[in-house]
Amino acid sequence: MDSGNNLRIGLPSKGRLSDIAGDLLKQAGLSFRRQSRGLFARVSGLPVELIFLRTDDIPTLCAEGAIDMGITGSDLLEESGGSAEVRMRLGVGRCRLAICVPDDANLNSAADLDGKRIATSFPAITKRYLAKHQASAHLVALSGSVEVMIQLGVADAIVDLVETGSTLAANRLRILEEIDSYETVLIQNDRCRDTETADRVVRRLEGVVIARDYSLLEYNVPRSKLEAAEAITPGFNSPTVNTLEDPEWCSVRVMVKRGAVIDAMERLETVGASAVIETPISNCRL
């Protein structure tokens, strides 16, 4: 197929999000080989071309039609104000965007920032948020190292992404207000050159993302207790049940939410189940 007709997917060229995106694609069977610092790569077995870009450029390039899809942060998508839409949430790279001020600052809400200086890499989001709180500030737009701007005398407050809060503590800062929560997303524009392949990509990625939330639970149970066991682990349509050599017993295989596995195992024991085994799932179709 002519490479000009290939589905183009933009991926972060470096950093933690680059590793996350690359691993996710490979887990979904979208294997590729990128040359050192290469900007392009082909996906094996599919008419898909990967283009490695600056993460914050991906929303704009997708909206403009230079790429059909892209993996980026929902924070960057919102900041760009472009027309690309979220095709699916990938469940990784979660973080919070927050207004942060010095520990000893006499500031108690966003409204108190009226007339103050705020350093941020997200001026558009910050401006909209302040407007909702009847505040207007002088925004200092930066591309990084925002957390030191207060100490340098550049700003009275910052708006930055927060994960654990350890960086804030190290710089004697506290969260004044959280603006929103964000995560890594797959985006797509409305002029996608190959919607059929785009749908296949989405379906493959969904298989990986959904599988993260489930485990396969297998156990043996007396046939007389099968109904009680099925009530504990109902599965999606119904559990897979097989008869064992002893007709009084059967084996059951069922998908269970990972967060509910331990509780389910304990409850299964109370109804007589044995040989209860949890197996992680790397991919699935539901």
Enumerate the predicted regions with their spans.
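Small-molecule-sensing regulatory modules
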Residues: 2-48, 72-85, 89-92, 96, ...
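Short, structured active-site "lid" loops
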Residues: 47-66
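Signature of uroporphyrinogen-III synthase
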Residues: 60, 96-100
